[in-house]
Amino acid sequence: MSARLADVIEVLDHAYPPRFAQSWDSVGLVCGDPEDVLEAITIAVDATPAVIDEVPDSGLLLVHHPLLLHGVDTVAVSTPKGALVHRLIRSGRSLFTAHTNADSASPGVSDALAHVFGLTVDAVLEPLLGVASLDKWVIYVPLEHVAAVQAAVFEAGAGHIGDYSHCSWSVTGTGQFMPHDGASPVVGSIGAIERVAEDRVEVVAPARARAAVLSAMHAAHPYEEPAFDIFALVPPPGDVGLGRIGTLPRPESLSAFVARVGAALPQTSSGVRATGDPDMLVSRVAVCGGAGDSLLSLAAVADVQAYVTADLRHHPADEHRRASNVALIDVAHWASEFPWCGQAADVLRSHFGTALSVRVCTIRTDPWNLGARRVNDVSDSGRDQ
């Protein structure tokens, strides 16, 4: 029972495309040879010494948080992270990271979080804007030359939409221009305004074919200076991006929902805290695995009653509480991302079946390991103004 590391990477890159990662992030293979043969995969949020202890020799450790996120100028064994890298390499173990690409993927980190709360996801809190891969060309062509220009740009790769080819749209109008000294007009005279019946021809083409379409258009167009526009088409928002919005099976009080959150997540020393009217009804919820205070403004206008995330700081939470009735539920960072480990395991098991041993490491890697609370020390019935 085994698989090549390269085959596992292919599956992970399909599930959590690297192009979804934030520009500052570090994702993918950290150490290991893609041609290595694996017999086991261990999944965790963090790569720590205790977690690595559970990874079999020649196995893969798949983690959410990058071990080497910021600029690194040494992996000497005398450094904490360097020592981990050396341990992995010496024992033939590999390390792979799926971080913000897993945050934005569908399903991804926030989908897993929503699932453990019993939410049915129906929207993305902050959709990921796609990279423009298509251009729309608008070309103004004298009527008698339209067919030739269309044929040329189609041959260069334009005009394909799904299973259709030679697609275009046109409308007739009037073009106007005045040739000046040095021009060699096909139509009109130097110094005289000329008006010509022209078609506005629109076609789409892959952005990668821009140079070919431009060359073909120039070659077929009768004018020495054709009038044309190129618009980069941004894909509409889809089901990928940060955070998710979902609906509970039935409304429940905020206090009941907070209890639901606490029961669904692994216990941590910081537990679960919330702000809002305990008796308010909650039916629609926004969630974001990991640090999510950057999405507070979106949660405030998302038609939800509550927002679950991690690492909420005092001032952003205070400003939100003053301006919005959306309840905030703050959980431990590690706990909010741990459900993703099970999701990633399902992805791998569904592809490799019994050919690979896939397990989730249950070691709590939350850095906070102690906590204390003195009940009734502080009133929560109001605030100082």
UniProtKB/Swiss-Prot annotation:
- Repressor among the record's keywords? no
Q: Supply the Gene3D superfamilies for this chain.
A: 3.30.70.120, NIF3 (NGG1p interacting factor 3)-like
> Record's GO cellular component, any one?
cytoplasm
Q: Which domain of life is it from?
A: Bacteria
Residues given in the record as a divalent metal cation 2 binding sites: 65, 333, 337
Where a divalent metal cation 1 binds, per the record, is at: 64, 103, 337
Q: Which SUPFAM superfamilies match?
A: NIF3 (NGG1p interacting factor 3)-like
Q: Which UniProt keywords apply?
A: Metal-binding
Molecular function GO labels: metal ion binding
Instruction: Output the Pfam families linked to this UniProt entry.
Output: DUF34_NIF3 (PF01784)
Please state which protein family the record places this protein in: Belongs to the GTP cyclohydrolase I type 2/NIF3 family.
The UniProt subunit note reads as follows: Homohexamer.
Name of this chain's protein: GTP cyclohydrolase 1 type 2 homolog
Taxon lineage: Bacteria, Bacillati, Actinomycetota, Actinomycetes, Mycobacteriales
